[in-house]
Curated annotation (Swiss-Prot):
Residues 83-118 are annotated as: Coil 1A. Residues 141-232 are annotated as: Coil 1B. GO terms for biological process: epithelial cell differentiation; intermediate filament organization. InterPro entries: IF_rod_dom, Keratin_I. The keyword Coiled coil applies. Residues 256-394 are annotated as: Coil 2. The gene is KRT26. It comes from Bos taurus. This is Keratin, type I cytoskeletal 26. Heterotetramer of two type I and two type II keratins. There are two types of cytoskeletal and microfibrillar keratin: I (acidic; 40-55 kDa) and II (neutral to basic; 56-70 kDa). GO terms for molecular function: structural molecule activity.
Length: 469
């Protein structure tokens, strides 16, 4: 089973295959730094890299500019230090999760190997099949497995949709917070520009006041000059002629014109200096504002990309944890099923062992019964042999008696011959059996008939009853 991780998608693909994490070009991308999850199950990024062996190495992928570094390192920037710790914790958790997945895969492979060995030993293809046939339940179990897998997949998809909705809401919240921070920074810049404008207005008002003072002074000088001219004209209108050899008088018009030109040059110089100072300050301030705005935009874009990658990784981690939980549930269910099957097999083995023990005991009982019957047979054969010997002995005795009585006379010899001819021996063996077929007792009846005289000889031998099994 393969899991494909991509930075542009929050979906989880799980086609059938090997249990190895593969992915395209995903990771924390900042500037020219990028990373991915490849065939070696490793994760790399500008903040560090994680491999499937659980090691964490700090990578050196740059963030593009010194301004971004300032935002990351400054505690008052847009990316505080706790998010670095969060990313490092996520990398560590991903590494430990990959180790746990490898351990579970090894345990699953071990269980599958044991199950395969058990099927090779007791399966349909082997000669040692179990007495109980479970093949009729295979279709039901397969149907239940398919239903469980479909329900588990549906639950995982619903959980993934819920997580996507929550992450979308978090995206909008973060976007709102970023826009609010940007608005506040712009308002702060506007307030700073307002203060600069107020300073420039105060400077302009001071210059206007100085210009008004100079204009008033010029007006006063003009007024004094006119009064002096009137006085001089009134004095020149009399009859007194006074000739004085004096130095030539000062030309007030030229003096005033020179003073006016000097003050105008001074005012123009002050105005040019103020305008140059204002332009210089405005240019540097505008340049600083544009630089700060560009740096803030770049840092904001970088931060948004990092947050987007973080959210993607969190979604993938949640999906992997859900899949891991489903695999653990399936493994526990499989273990419980096989434990139940093993318990049933052990019960069948115990029942078979009990049956074998009972058969063994019955065999022992039948063996004892056979030995007992064999003893009875031997005893009966001995009795028969003894009776045969007795009969043979009585026959010889009767013959000897016949030979002795032969010379006594014809009458006695005729009677003896008649008696010997009429002599007969009848033996009857009567046995008692119980319900199991065991011999309880034997009776042997011997009947001798000699010329209408019957003698009954009864032998009885009691045998012990069969020992109950």
């Amino acid at each position: 089973m393969s899991f494909r991780l991509s930075s542009g998608s929050r979906r989880l693909c799980s086609p059938a295959g090997s249990g190895q994490l593969t992915g395209g070009r995903t990771g924390f991308r900042a500037g020219n730094a990028c990373g991915g999850l490849g065939a070696g199950s490793s994760f790399s990024g500008p903040l560090g890299s994680v491999s499937s062996r659980g090691s964490f190495s700090h990578g050196g992928g740059g963030l593009g500019s010194g301004v971004c570094t300032g935002f990351l390192e400054n505690e008052h920037g847009l990316l505080p230090g706790n998010e670095k710790v969060t990313l490092q914790n996520l990398n560590d958790r991903l590494a430990s999760y990959l180790d746990h997945v490898c351990t579970l895969e090894e345990a699953n492979a071990d269980l599958e190997q044991k199950i395969k060995g058990w099927y090779e030993k007791y399966g349909p293809g082997s000669g040692r099949q179990l007495a109980y046939d479970c093949s009729k339940y295979f279709s039901v179990t397969e149907d239940l497995k398919r239903q469980i897998i479909s329900v588990t997949t549906c639950n995982a998809s619903i959980a993934l949709q819920n997580e996507n909705a929550r992450l979308t809401a978090d995206d909008f919240r973060l976007k709102y917070e970023n826009e609010l921070a940007l608005n506040q920074s712009v308002e702060a810049d506007i307030n700073g520009l307002h203060r600069v404008m107020e300073e420039l207005t105060l400077c302009t008002s001071d210059l206007e006041i100085q210009c008004e003072a100079l204009s008033e002074e010029l007006t006063c000088l003009k007024k004094n000059h006119q009064e002096e001219m009137k006085v001089m004209q009134g004095a020149a209108g009399g009859n007194v002629n006074v000739e004085i050899n004096a130095a030539p008088g000062v030309d007030l018009t030229v003096l005033l014109n020179n003073m006016r030109a000097e003050y105008e040059d001074l005012a123009e110089q002050n105005r040019e200096d103020a305008e140059a100072w204002f332009n210089e300050k405005s240019t540097s301030l505008h340049q600083q504002i544009s630089d700060d705005a560009g740096a803030a935009t770049a840092a904001r874009n970088e931060l948004m990309e990092l947050k987007r990658n973080l959210q993607t990784l969190e979604i993938e981690l949640q999906s992997l944890m859900a899949m891991k939980h489903s695999y653990e549930c399936s493994l526990a269910e499989t273990e419980s099923n096989y434990c139940h099957q093993l318990q049933q097999i052990q019960e069948q083995i115990g029942a078979t062992e009990d049956q074998l023990q009972q058969i063994r005991m019955e065999t022992e009982g039948q063996k004892l019964e056979h030995e007992r019957l064999l003893d009875v047979k031997i005893f009966l054969e001995k009795e028969i042999e003894m009776y045969c010997k007795l009969i043979d002995g009585e026959g010889r005795k009767s013959k000897s008696t016949y030979c002795k009585s032969e010379g006594r006379g014809p009458k006695n010899s005729e009677n003896q011959v008649k008696d010997s001819k009429e002599e007969a021996v009848v033996k009857t063996v009567v046995g008692e059996l119980d319900q199991l077929g065991s011999v309880l007792s034997l009776r042997v009846h011997s009947v001798e008939e000699k010329s209408s005289k019957i003698s009954n000889i009864t032998m009885e031998q009691r045998l012990p009853s069969k020992v109950p099994q």
